[in-house]
Amino acid sequence: MSIFIGGAWPYANGSLHLGHIASLLPGDILARYYRAKGEHVLYVSGSDCNGTPITIRAKQEGVTVKEIADKYHEEFERCFRSLGFTYDCYTRTDSEHHHETVQKVFLRLLEEGYIYKKVVEQAYCETCTQFLPDRYVEGICPHCHEAARGDQCDACSAILDPLDLLEKKCKLCGSTPSVQETEHFYFALHKFQQQIKEAVEIAKQKGTWRDNAIQLTERYLKEGLQDRAVSRDLPIGVPIPVAGYEDKKIYVWIEAVTGYYSASKHWVEETGKDDQEFWDKEAKTYYVHGKDNIPFHSIIWPAVLLGIGEEAIPRHIVSNEYLTVEKRKLSTSKNWAVWVPDILERYNPDSIRYFLTVNAPENRDTDFSWREFIYSHNSELLGAYGNFVNRTLKFIEKYYGGTVPKGSIDVELKDKVEGLYKSVGEAIEQTKFKVALETIFDAVRFANKYFDEKQPWKQREDDPVSCEETIYNCVYLIANFAQLLEPFLPFSSERVRNTLSSVKVNWEPQNTLPNRIDNVQPLFERIDVKQIEHEVEKLYGAVK
């Protein structure tokens, strides 16, 4: 089976925060799971280095756009690597291969009659002497009357035209823009209304899109899909490949999402492999992002793919809701966020992955609190999983000199483990990651109970053969937990496999156990609960 996984592209205008990771982590869980099953996986993403936010940040800091893009792209790569993300290709939108691919897609859509020219009115700043791209205009949403950008309202998810905003202001200088005529290219989205409607119906029947993606897309379809501008007067970006229009740039509506396609082509260049299997209609595709990116993946990207004749339109849309911080809406401008480079300096990446999965905003907004984060680490990772692994392996080290005792696998335990691979695998494929991880930890708690009830410390004296059976079965459980938890907790899983001299990762019961164990070390360290107060004070102290 061919599995394509696309993770949304973060803007390279500032550090990643936990809200980004909460929405992107499911992509890595999927990639690790399907690879363990032996499927062909292509997992791609990259840094958006062309967006308006980067230009604005560069102007604010008095540096070049490239300096800003380079700084954060490199930081993103480090953060994703430290968190265990396993992208097959992580690239950037200011690269030559991305520009070439986007231009080819633009020309193909133009040739097929899906892109046309149109004279329109656009916001123009007399002070800055330039036409203002959508994100350069800020004001009040005409639908919900909350603060909004010129392209989209985060409060009500309405797609906007900058001229629709009330109380319009130029983001750069704060002055009120005028309105002037200019010519732009438009994407004929209305031509794809029926095909996208059919795709939504299929997703609804099969449950392959998150509810928020279905509801929002149905809303847009009910209103009727509106043609969208796909060119803008921007200082950076992909130039329009049409004579006389080279000064205009291909707009984010099709440029950013085409990054999935350009990353795939870049992967081909790097590896010499063929990517066509991932764009075939039989391919299983997953697009992983936050709910603010839904229309790009449920409407724009399917329309682009249909327009260029590719059949692998998004089959699974994994659109998480928002993550709040200490019960407050995350705000980068006010510095109310938990920044990824910062948390990685002090905490285990598996602790971060665990919390953001069991507390994932899969169907509703969820909250990150330092209290819950630290208590979940101490009680679940250290107290349940780490405790079971450590008490078993230390027992072997102490009483058997590191040699795993011989035994036979308990039939009840074997059935339980085989059932785990099936139920956890199904939950992952259905993008129910929280359910999948909770199912494994239910089994971890069962394993601790098994150890306690068997009382091997007593069996060793009273019934040595039964003690060997107990410990053998505990090692059997540990070996399988290391496989089952690999998509979620890759670092601790690798450490367990190394201790058991089991290198291979595959999604099937591990029935062959090691003869010896080596170098038993605790999987997790206890976090001092005093850290809670320290972290909360630090968070409040950094607020602007």
UniProtKB/Swiss-Prot annotation:
Its EC number is 6.1.1.10. Pfam families: Anticodon_3, tRNA-synt_1g. GO terms for biological process: methionyl-tRNA aminoacylation. Binds 1 zinc ion per subunit. It catalyses: tRNA(Met) + L-methionine + ATP = L-methionyl-tRNA(Met) + AMP + diphosphate. Its cofactor is Zn(2+). GO terms for molecular function: ATP binding; metal ion binding; methionine-tRNA ligase activity. GO terms for cellular component: cytosol. Its main location: cytoplasm. It comes from the Bacteria. Zn(2+) binds at C141, C144, C153, C156. It is an enzyme of class 6 (ligase). The keyword Aminoacyl-tRNA synthetase applies. ATP binds at T332. Is required not only for elongation of protein synthesis but also for the initiation of all mRNA translation through initiator tRNA(fMet) aminoacylation. Monomer. Belongs to the class-I aminoacyl-tRNA synthetase family. MetG type 1 subfamily. This is Methionine--tRNA ligase. The gene is metG.
